[in-house]
Structure formats: C-alpha cells, structure tokens
C-alpha cells in the first residue's frame, strides 16, 4: 500500500479507530498507566512503532525472527525501544506469552487470519489475550475485492476460481490461506471468539481504483472523505481490499 503524503489516507480510518479506543482506555485509567497493546503477527512494527510513539506499551508476537529484528531497529530509530517488546512465537502460544496482568487493553490481529491454519483457534486466542471489556482489532483480506481485482487485470480464470472457492483462494499458488467477507469475519469473532462486534469498516474501498491523487487543492481531501464514507456504506464497504472489525471481549471495563 502506498500512502498519499499530501492528505489523510485510507489507513487513517483504522488508525483513528485505534486511537479512539486507546483514548477510552486512558480515560478509564485516569491517565495513570500506559495502555497495554498486544500485536499478534505484527512483524516489523507497522502498527507497533506508531502506537509506542503514542505512549503505549506494545508487545509484538511474530514467528519471524527477521521481522522482529526489523521491529527492534525501527523502534530504536523512533526512540521507543523501551516501550516495544518483541517475542518470537505464534498465535497458538499466546497463553504462554501473555503477562500475568489480566490481559491487554487492546489486541491487534492485523493481516493474521489470512495465514493461520486454524482461524477459529486464532480468534479464541486473541479474545483470551484481551482483558475483560477490552477490544480486539482484526484486519483481514476481503474476498470480493480480490475477485474484482483479478477481473480488471484480465485474470478471469483466477477470478472465477476465487469466487467459487469456499476459502476465497484462486489456486494452489495463492499465498493466502483464505479471504473473507464481512459476514464471515463477524461470525468468526462473535460465534467462535465470543466477542461483541462494534465496528465493521472497509479499508481501502475506492482508493486503490484511483491511479493518482485527484487534482485541485481539495482533491486529496475529497478522496479521503469519499473513502471514509464508502468504508461505512454497504455494499461498497464489502468490496474493500481489507475488512476492519473492532470487537470487544465481554466484561466490565
């Protein structure tokens, strides 16, 4: 994904949702402690380093030693190495990795469910790692955007296979184990994870269809506003490249 430097981008909707949640965490705590964030599959720190820069204590769990090395380097460069903890492991080991502190204030599973062998077990592990009343944020590859993208690229046979496949894959060479639609993600989090879904948004609904930033002083801002609205509006929301869901673990906050 290439950010548009001159104006807010589609990723801002996800980042804003996380900031809102963390502001609520700080308010409940009276500002007495840094929010605890657990980023599962967080790799090189795309989300972890900015969150640490916002004052969070972030633990990143990833199976790749190389990605975690990049994370440590980025955290040092950003001056937040003391607020980022890197742990090599996978979602199956969350129960052993988590501190005995009652769970995280925010759990991220961004770009995770596409790759795990057992998404039900993964979602249950994410839910179990969140403190009661805390949020789980999931970002997963959207099925319908992948179909349309292949049609536009002239890869019609792949689009047909992807549309017909129960897991939303285009073939044996597909690097993803699955893609999902909004109903599938919601059911996975609610039915299998025991979470309460609060927000479902499309992430990059229309922005990827625009070859360049629109002209004019308000062009980029207009695109960002359109993207924000489309991400909340079915059926456009359901055509997004990725689906963002914020769900909450039941319990007192």
Where in the sequence are the language-model features?
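A conserved beta-strand element that flanks and buttresses the S-adenosyl-L-methionine
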Residues: 108
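Conserved class I S-adenosyl-L-methionine
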Residues: 33-41, 135-164
């Amino acid at each position: 994904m290439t950010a548009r430097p001159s104006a807010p981008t589609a990723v801002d909707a996800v980042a804003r949702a996380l900031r809102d949640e963390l502001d609520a965490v700080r308010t409940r705590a009276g500002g007495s402690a840094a929010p605890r964030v657990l980023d599962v599959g967080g790799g090189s720190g795309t989300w972890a380093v900015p969150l640490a820069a916002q004052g969070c204590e972030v633990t990143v769990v990833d199976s790749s030693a190389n990605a975690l090395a990049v994370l440590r380097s980025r955290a040092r460069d950003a001056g937040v190495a003391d607020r980022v903890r890197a742990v090599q492991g996978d979602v199956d080991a969350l129960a052993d990795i988590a501190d005995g502190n009652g769970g995280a204030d925010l759990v991220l599973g961004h770009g995770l469910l596409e790759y795990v062998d057992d998404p039900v077990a993964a979602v249950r592990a994410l839910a179990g790692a969140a403190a009661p009343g805390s949020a789980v944020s999931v970002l997963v590859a959207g099925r319908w955007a992948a179909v349309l993208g292949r049609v536009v690229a002239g890869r019609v046979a792949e689009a047909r296979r992807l549309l017909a496949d129960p897991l939303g894959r285009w073939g044996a060479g597909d690097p993803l184990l699955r893609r999902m639609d909004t109903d599938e993600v919601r059911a996975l989090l609610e039915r299998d994870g025991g979470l309460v879904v609060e927000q479902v948004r499309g992430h990059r609904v229309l922005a990827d269809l625009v070859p360049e930033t629109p002209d004019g002083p308000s062009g980029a801002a207009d695109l960002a506003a359109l993207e924000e609205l489309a991400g909340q509006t079915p059926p456009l929301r359901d055509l997004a490249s990725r689906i963002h869901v914020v769900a909450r673990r039941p319990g007192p906050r």
